[in-house]
């Protein structure tokens, strides 16, 4: 159902979400394929369908604009803008730095007996954290993001990665702003 998407396009200042752009792109591709199939048939074939498709506009320029921004998974392409590509590269770099530093802290904590030998990095509230037994929670400097239901385990973001994680969050906010800018631009073009 495209009506809600088309209605949303009509609202000045609004923008389509990536998945809405993907749905519109899919519909435009389908329309182009159907019209192309019918019009490519030999003369005399499907006369009624040919008559129906004669006036159908398939908007190739809009389809190309959507394809430039939206990928086959319905997400905004990194290549949609140089800015987005740069931001996403920086995000990947920061994620790698955080993972490497967390792994170092975790290994040190394991060898010191502060955390269990089978402890693994996990995510709590969007932050990479280390699970630490309640008795050892003061032995790792950092920010406590969560505790287990039993209260026996605390999930700590080590101080060594707090700044890197803050930078990562800032990059994710930049990414979100750039994606919204691209989708707003694309929606205005569709309008």
What do these predicted regions represent?
Residues 15-19, 47, 63-191:
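Alpha-helical coupling/stalk and coiled-coil linker elements that connect catalytic or binding modules
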């Amino acid at each position: 159902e495209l009506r809600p998407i088309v209605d949303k396009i009509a609202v000045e200042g609004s923008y389509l979400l990536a998945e809405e752009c993907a749905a519109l792109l899919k519909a435009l591709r389908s329309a182009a394929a159907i019209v192309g199939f019918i019009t490519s048939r030999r003369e005399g074939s499907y006369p009624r369908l040919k008559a129906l498709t004669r006036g159908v506009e398939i908007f190739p320029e809009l389809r190309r604009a959507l394809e430039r921004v939206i990928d086959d998974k319905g997400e905004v392409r990194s290549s949609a803008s140089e800015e987005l590509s740069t931001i996403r590269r920086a995000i990947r770099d920061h994620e790698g730095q955080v993972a490497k530093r967390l792994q170092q802290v975790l290994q040190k904590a394991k060898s010191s007996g502060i955390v269990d030998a089978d402890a693994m990095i996990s995510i709590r509230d969007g932050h990479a954290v280390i699970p630490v037994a309640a008795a050892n929670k003061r032995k790792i400097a950092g920010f406590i993001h969560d505790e287990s239901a039993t209260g026996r385990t605390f999930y700590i973001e080590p101080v060594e990665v707090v700044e890197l994680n803050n930078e990562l969050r800032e990059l994710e906010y930049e990414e979100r702003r750039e994606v919204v800018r691209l989708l707003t631009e694309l929606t205005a073009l569709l309008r």
